[in-house]
Amino acid sequence: MGKTLFDKLWNRHVIYGKEGEPQLLYVDLHLIHEVTSPQAFEGLRMENRPLRRPDKTFATMDHNVPTEDIFNIQDLVAKKQIEALQTNCEEFGVTLADMGSDRQGIVHMVGPETGLTQPGKVIVCGDSHTATHGAFGAIGFGIGSSEVEHVFATQTIWQQKPKSMGIEINGKLPKGVYAKDIILHLIATYGVAFGTGYAVEYYGETIRNMSMEERMTICNMAIEGGAKMGMMAPDQTTFEYVRGREYAPSDMEKAIRDWETLKTDPDAEYDLHIEMDASILEPYVTWGTNPEMGVPFSKAFPEIKDMNYERAYEYMGLKPGQTAEEIELGYVFIGSCTNARLSDLEEAARIVKGNKVKNNIRALVVPGSRQVRNAAEAIGLDKIFKDAGFEWREPGCSMCLGMNPDQVPDGVHCASTSNRNFEGRQGKGARTHLVSPAMAAAAAINGHFIDIRKEAVISGGN
């Protein structure tokens, strides 16, 4: 019987262990940031251990970065974590994309942009959205601080092999529907736990026709569906994305010959298989307090089916039967490792251009990396957003999570292009609605959610 992409990647990296038991995997790339690395570095010091492979470790600042003024760090804990990463990287010989560096940004954007993320690798990071890197035909997953220390010391990690799931996605996306809507649809349909215990491969016509940035959006949220890993087979689109980047292989043609073997064999079988027709999708909006609680734009919010729904409605200040258009928005956030890439900003700017943010909305655009910010400014996107009344910020995780100054006030509804809508995720009492960048942009200039499939409703002015 043939092998799945996941089987091939996993088998390449097993150092020790029997099938059915935890196995020791070799780690090709360890990405770190300021929040989950200090304890691990301190553990090395206490045991007087060296960092085994500094050359396979790369650091950046993202979670705590104040995006209004990156050097004005008011929070003492955040400042201490940032200073600790600077000290630790210098002491242990780790390359750091420091504050203000041309390479600084959200860790899951910096890896691909620099060419560190490549097909065939096992990539780990102390962050749950490490599945993003699976879009390149890699195994990427998040780890805890104790595991970060283990990788520091050994360049390996113990893992129980998950089962395999294949999600076949075919059909052309309708106008106004994006990669973000695909993953929100999957989670709303099958739940936040359907991927638990699985490594998911997304494939099919729809995936083949996507850019790398769109593919990363889908893999980024594999964890929201319960899966530890999400991945896609590398193809010519992947190879051309990697080609010419700072850390791309010196012999690309040799690398490509190897990468071309990283695909599921025709006679391979997944432990679970799901099919999806992308041509019938609508723009999605979440109404509740986990990504499963989402609906197509044309649908009303569902009836209460259990205590979780009851609590979610109470927290969000909403009721069954309401629609997304009725939500009283106060904030719009375009950013995060899910949707802060150049193509995301270009699509948002296309909708925003020539319009104005409504008076009831505070709107932020936070590029995911310095590279994206520079590229956006080179083609005038910053001017489009600023002329419309958006705040144009420095790169960082920003309003995706309440760990920096960018937070949504208590009780305020926010249209967000991020990946999680948990209680308090964007700040104490914040009410988060997950959407695509286009939906967020249209909401900012209309003052509420609209059906972006109807061009006539995209109009601005205060």
From Swiss-Prot:
Keyword terms of this UniProt record: 4Fe-4S, Amino-acid biosynthesis, Branched-chain amino acid biosynthesis, Iron, Iron-sulfur, Leucine biosynthesis, Lyase, Metal-binding
Example GO molecular function: 3-isopropylmalate dehydratase activity
Reaction catalysis annotation: (2R,3S)-3-isopropylmalate = (2S)-2-isopropylmalate
Top-level taxon of the source organism: Bacteria
PANTHER family, sorted: 3-ISOPROPYLMALATE DEHYDRATASE, HOMOACONITASE, MITOCHONDRIAL-RELATED
Keyword Metal-binding included in the entry's annotation: yes
GO biological process, one term: L-leucine biosynthetic process
Binding site for [4Fe-4S] cluster: C337, C397, C400
Protein name stated in the entry: 3-isopropylmalate dehydratase large subunit
CDD domains: IPMI
Family, similarity comment: Belongs to the aconitase/IPM isomerase family. LeuC type 1 subfamily.
Gene (UniProt): leuC
EC number: 4.2.1.33
Oligomer status and interactors: Heterodimer of LeuC and LeuD.
